[in-house]
Amino acid sequence: MASNMDREMILADFQACTGIENIDEAITLLEQNNWDLVAAINGVIPQENGILQSDFGGETMPGPTFDPASHPAPASTPSSSAFRPVMPSRQIVERQPRMLDFRVEYRDRNVDVVLEDSCTVGEIKQILENELQIPVPKMLLKGWKTGDVEDSTVLKSLHLPKNNSLYVLTPDLPPPSSSSHAGALQESLNQNFMLIITHREVQREYNLNFSGSSTVQEVKRNVYDLTSIPVRHQLWEGWPASATDDSMCLAESGLSYPCHRLTVGRRTSPVQTREQSEEQSTDVHMVSDSDGDDFEDASEFGVDDGEVFGMASSTLRKSPMMPENAENEGDALLQFTAEFSSRYGDCHPVFFIGSLEAAFQEAFYVKARDRKLLAIYLHHDESVLTNVFCSQMLCAESIVSYLSQNFITWAWDLTKDTNRARFLTMCNRHFGSVIAQTIRTQKTDQFPLFLIIMGKRSSNEVLNVIQGNTTVDELMMRLMAAMEIFSAQQQEDIKDEDEREARENVKREQDEAYRLSLEADRAKREAHEREMAEQFRLEQIRKEQEEEREAIRLSLEQALPPEPKEENAEPVSKLRIRTPSGEFLERRFLASNKLQIVFDFVASKGFPWDEFKLLSTFPRRDVTQLDPNKSLLEVNLFPQETLFLQAKE
């Protein structure tokens, strides 16, 4: 592993040999070749007749190349170059064409383009015109690290790496008006947009996460809470032209996904605006005076490795990534996100704002179908790998997109000892002493770390610990490998959850059926009890009525005069009375007896005269309609008569 001083000299020699001025790109190429200067130069400038020879030994290729044996390398000094065989490389008169790979994204399509670095940007657009059927004048090709470029720009002048990612914008073309637009809008409503909002007056950035269903008005109100600038005094830059109404939801406003940069300031008077412009111009002039000597004076003024190997466009760090002894993890992560954006740009993973326990809840303690992996990014400012890892790997569009879709990303800064100790305590509590000891023993140059956590039924499992000395492809491969393991476990969890839910549904249905059965039985029992009570009541009434009738019958029977004999001195009338059942009642009465006595006799036999009537046949008449005080002789029921009992209607 080369020392920091050696790396400074290797970096300077590499830029001098290749002409690459972009420090980030140069560091990336050297990292890919493990800081082997010769291998890195050969990767950028391949030769026809052989490769450059290192003064550290190795096989010598034939040809008029430099002979290291005849020129021994002197001992390295702080002012000497770590790479001596540079000049002989110019003796090679011709270089092989360098091929560049481009992956261009347009809406839901990816187009792969392979061109020589001697081609122009316009040739890429011509290929895309055939593939995407988009006219070149309507096409904006974005994603260049150097900013917007002209169509006539030669690719070689951009000093691009071998693999590049670009995207196409077509602001002058109308969006597709097919039926899929509604589905795309619905999908956008469910997406989360990261708005990177710069407060112009204080030069501070806020990373705010909003759902697609949030409105522009809600964004402005949240910014008011952060900046104390009332909505009516907010002056915005960066909103799409389609965002003309504050009631419009973010999914319809045309924001870039997953990140979009905005700038907000306070509306001021013309005098204040002119004064601020003069101050800003002065500040810019002062900064530009010192920019040219930053790199040359780095070692002289004791600038640390992180600043030497940092992004070319970044300035000196004004604040730490995370405050020391932060009591609230959410506030600490807000500062971390803002500082991360200011250092590495607005396209970065969406860091979860909240405690580690809250991140667990968001990732693991939901329905199996909604669970995600948890990615924990551990930052360290004193590591030489940090800036390259953040700017080239962690902020790569492919990594950002994959993390936002499949992971909950949580971050912590281990630069300060207090924050490091606090995280180790959390790590020991949630992941066990083994993982805590692994992180504790990591050296500074092995940071940053990327932990991939999968939630299980009773514990949290660390699937992978990714160190900072990696590449975008390797990082993506390890993320995808973790995702495969998680997907297999997720399918099992979904199956178990569905089975458990099915069992619970069956149990609920059984409980409901049992409850309904109990209610039906109770209702039936209550109805039966009511019926029995009604029957008992009616039976009691019937018995009382029968007893009453029996008492009346007995009293009438006792009140009847004795039946006269056939040989009585007084005239006797013999009556035969046929009952409804066909039986006959026979009795003798004195002809002088009143008709009421006959009625009482019939009633004493169970046929009360108010329910039955007596009928005679010749002549046919209703005897019960006659005057009961008349004698039998007076009503012609003498000497004998046959009568019929008939129930009254």
Curated annotation (Swiss-Prot):
Region of interest (Disordered), residue spans: 56-84, 266-290
What segments bear the compositional bias annotation Low complexity?
A: 68-82
Pfam families from the xrefs? FAF1, UBA_4, UBX
Q: Which GO terms describe its cellular component?
A: cytoplasm; cytosol; nuclear envelope; nucleoplasm; nucleus; ooplasm; perinuclear region of cytoplasm; VCP-NPL4-UFD1 AAA ATPase complex
Q: Which residues carry this modification: Phosphoserine?
A: S319, S581
Subcellular location(s) of the protein? Nucleus
Matches recorded under CDD domains: UAS_FAF1, UBA_FAF1, Ubl1_FAF1, Ubl_FAF1, UBX_UBXN3A, UDM1_RNF168_RNF169-like
Q: What is its main location?
A: nucleus
- Where Phosphothreonine occurs, residue numbers? T579
Ordered alphabetically, the record's keywords are: Apoptosis, Nucleus, Phosphoprotein
Q: Does the keyword Nucleus apply?
A: yes
GO MF terms here are:
heat shock protein binding; NF-kappaB binding; protein domain specific binding; protein kinase binding; ubiquitin binding; ubiquitin protein ligase binding
All copies of the UBX domain together span 568-645
Alphabetized InterPro entries for the sequence: FAF1-like_UBX, FAF1_2-like_UAS, FAF1_UBA, Thioredoxin-like_sf, UAS, Ubiquitin-like_domsf, UBX_dom, UBX_domain-protein
* Alphabetical GO biological process terms: apoptotic process; Fas signaling pathway; negative regulation of canonical NF-kappaB signal transduction; positive regulation of DNA replication; positive regulation of extrinsic apoptotic signaling pathway via death domain receptors; positive regulation of protein catabolic process; regulation of cell adhesion; regulation of protein catabolic process
Residues forming the UBA domain are: 1-57
> What assembly does the database describe for this protein?
Interacts with CDT1 and ATPase VCP/p97. Interacts (via UBA domain) with FAS (via death domain). Interacts (via UBA domain) with NLRP12 (via DAPIN/PYRIN domain).
Q: What the protein does?
A: Ubiquitin-binding protein. Required for the progression of DNA replication forks by targeting DNA replication licensing factor CDT1 for degradation. Potentiates but cannot initiate FAS-induced apoptosis.
Q: What is this protein called?
A: FAS-associated factor 1
Native organism: Mus musculus
